[in-house]
Amino acid sequence: MLFGTAVVTGVMLMWPLVSRLLGASTPQVGPTEAVQLINRRDALVLDVRDKTDFAAGHIPNARNIPLPELDGRLREIEKFKARPIVINCQSGARSAGVCGLLKKNGFGEVFSLRGGIGGWVEASLPVEK
């Protein structure tokens, strides 16, 4: 019992380091935090889903650049480098990689929307078509 407690405690103490090494340090925001960034700091919402998914429903005022096109279209969002950017995908899985790409290209504050559009809808927040 004591050994098990020691192992669990050790894992908990090491978790921040391990998660950083595994790339889990991508800043995430939930839907409520994203709304605050949008309203208070004029954050850009970048939706990296394909055009069909975007047309079916997206966060109001989101800009759509499908993930396969993003690298070639970064110039379109250059003017937003000084603003927070919330990356949105279907479930939140792809947006972490996009955050890394934007960081490497000089974008300062980038956040992955936890749960993606699904989390947004689940929080009963508006979508437009």
Feature roles, as predicted:
Residues M1-A43, K51-P84, R94-K129:
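Rhodanese-like catalytic fold shared by cysteine-dependent sulfurtransferases
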Residues L46:
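Conserved beta/loop motifs at nucleotide-recognition and modification sites
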Residues I87-N88:
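Short, surface-exposed ligand- or partner-binding patches at beta-edge/loop junctions that are enriched
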